[in-house]
Amino acid sequence: MGKLFGTFGVRGIANEEITPEFALKIGMAFGTLLKREGRERPLVVVGRDTRVSGEMLKDALISGLLSTGCDVIDVGIAPTPAIQWATNHFNADGGAVITASHNPPEYNGIKLLEPNGMGLKKEREAIVEELFFSEDFHRAKWNEIGELRKEDIIKPYIEAIKNRVDVEAIKKRRPFVVVDTSNGAGSLTLPYLLRELGCKVVSVNAHPDGHFPARNPEPNEENLKGFMEIVKALGADFGVAQDGDADRAVFIDENGRFIQGDKTFALVADAVLRENGGGLLVTTIATSNLLDDIAKRNGAKVMRTKVGDLIVARALLENNGTIGGEENGGVIFPDFVLGRDGAMTTAKIVEIFAKSGKKFSELIDELPKYYQFKTKRHVEGDRKAIVAKVAELAEKKGYKIDTTDGTKIIFDDGWVLVRASGTEPIIRIFSEAKSEEKAREYLELGIKLLEEALKG
């Protein structure tokens, strides 16, 4: 039997790997699972991002669900977190999102959701895979085929976010925010949310267009160079950029400086933990020690997991976590949506900024300082075995290691992580330390150990 799902859902080139027939079968497999679990008329929420192939794949997936006797709520184009929120909001039995997140425009994918909006559990995912390949589908009688209805979730989703922040404090300061939604699903939410919060807003690339004509939807520093200049030139308080499905938010300060995701995650975590009087912060093995400092400051605990937003979300749910996130700008508010939410993150950052009375750059520069370096090596063959060899070498040399995900060598003032990519023939090396010199030294150590491991 083949393997369909990656860390969260399945992705590929639209109409080559992810075809209408493929989406139809996923819909039939998911619907069959829900029917076999004893639900008489399962209800499934389905939505998509702005990709050109989205409508085709959504309609095929819905057809598959209807054929098994599932009722479907089609929410159209919406951010992934809005669809996750809606799945929970409508008390649905499951959800499905047609998205390839930050991938280039020719890609698309499918994510399946639990009733609480979180990504499907591994054991249920395995059943969907088994049904997909065996084609042992439940086919409803002609008079038991599911019904389809359409719902607009954008307004209630925006209202739900507004209810979670201090709108009056924001209106009082009236921040000037420049927004780049990458022609993605966030185009329908973020500019409107910020205006309703009382911000002055200038938006760029904010019309839905699945060709992503303005930039690659991955909101990294390289792709945001032009946007960084716009934020500075307009004299904005800060800028915010999103990826294709709007589950992440990346920030630019008033000087046009790109802010690393773990710094904005730290700002949010600091506020949330303070409001909760402590709690549990969940993040990955690759995130900055800055988050440990923030947790300590607020009397909170830290749990570190493997890399992956769904892994963080599961850990938050299982351990009653307070706040979660990753170094790439993805923040999870578990009592709102059990997944990364770019709009909720932005609303919280706007509130923090408004209440502080400070410049955005000041909020960032007040955080404990760490230096980070990253590099990568193209490696064919069994990358996990090579990373395991790095662990063996490090242990022999007497280093303290953590093998939660890859090989992390831990020092008193920093760390280096050697980790195989789950999607590309690449091994990544990340380092961090309190000084630039040490961070470089740790990166060099990671490179040296990897080279030794590659020699065998």
Swiss-Prot record:
Can also use Ni(2+), Mn(2+) and Zn(2+), to a lesser extent. Its EC number is 5.4.2.2, 5.4.2.8. GO terms for biological process: carbohydrate metabolic process. Mg(2+) binds at residues 101, 243, 245, 247. The modification Phosphoserine is found at residue 101. The active site is at 101 (phosphoserine intermediate). Its cofactor is Mg(2+). Induction: Up-regulated in the presence of starch. Optimum pH is 7.0 for PGM activity. Activated by phosphorylation. InterPro entries: A-D-PHexomutase_a/b/a-I (IPR005844), A-D-PHexomutase_a/b/a-I/II/III (IPR016055), A-D-PHexomutase_a/b/a-II (IPR005845), A-D-PHexomutase_a/b/a-III (IPR005846), A-D-PHexomutase_C (IPR005843), A-D-PHexomutase_C_sf (IPR036900), Alpha-D-phosphohexomutase_SF (IPR005841), GlmM_arc-type (IPR024086). Optimum temperature is 90 degrees Celsius for PGM activity. Keywords: Isomerase, Magnesium, Metal-binding, Phosphoprotein. One of its GO terms (molecular function) is phosphomannomutase activity. It catalyses: alpha-D-glucose 1-phosphate = alpha-D-glucose 6-phosphate; alpha-D-mannose 1-phosphate = D-mannose 6-phosphate. NCBIfam families: Arch_GlmM. Catalyzes the interconversion of glucose 1-phosphate and glucose 6-phosphate, and the interconversion of mannose 1-phosphate and mannose 6-phosphate. Also displays low activity with deoxyribose 1-phosphate and glucosamine 1-phosphate. Homotetramer. Belongs to the phosphohexose mutase family. This is Phosphoglucomutase/phosphomannomutase.
